[in-house]
Amino acid sequence: MSRLRIYDDANHDTPVAVLEDHAAIADALGKVGVRFEQWEANQPIQPGASQDEVIAAYRSDIDRLMQENGYQAVDVISLKPDHPDRAAFRSKFLNEHTHSEDEVRFFVAGAGQFTLHINGQVYEVLCEKGDLIGVPDGTPHWFDMSVSPYFVAIRLFTNTEGWVAKFTGEDIAERFPRMDPHPSAANAS
């Protein structure tokens, strides 16, 4: 189940709000400029699927988003718990960073946790299958896939170079909860 926890950025122990209703999550995130939608993830895709398989399965949705928002590139990240580079992939995204473009992800399978640092608050968004999140350019955030990653996500970019981060140098990400492994990860290896 998708979830949003909102914290004061000085207090990582107790959230000031916890939301699990998609409409409530979308409303709360929309107020800070973050896009959050629930889509049908109805193609039979599992972590480990090839990029070509995933893109082919969702080609019409990808084309529509690219046309609506001017995205120039698309790729797929697909990880499961036995991926040999899972620790390196995880550490790449765990520190607070920004981008010069929106960060848009559609979760085709599994889950991942985006944590956004906006206006003195921390928005911890657990994205699951069917969730689309759009983090505006310049928004400080980090991403956790857990120690046992289990997800497939389509990534859309306006920059043809793909994922390019500017790290803030702040240690705030170290003070907030990490993502627990997805329940499906136990059976995925």
Question: Where in this protein do the model-derived segments appear?
Answer:
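Double-stranded beta-helix
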Residues: 146-189
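Conserved short histidine dyad/triad with adjacent acidic residue
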Residues: 75-100
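N-terminal leader/capping segments at the start of a protein or of a new domain
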Residues: 1-68
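Conserved metal-binding segment of the jelly-roll/cupin
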Residues: 127-147
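A short secondary-structure junction signal
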Residues: 116-119, 124-126, 145-146, 165-167
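Polybasic, positively charged surfaces/segments
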Residues: 72
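Short, conserved beta-strand element in jelly-roll/cupin
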Residues: 98-118
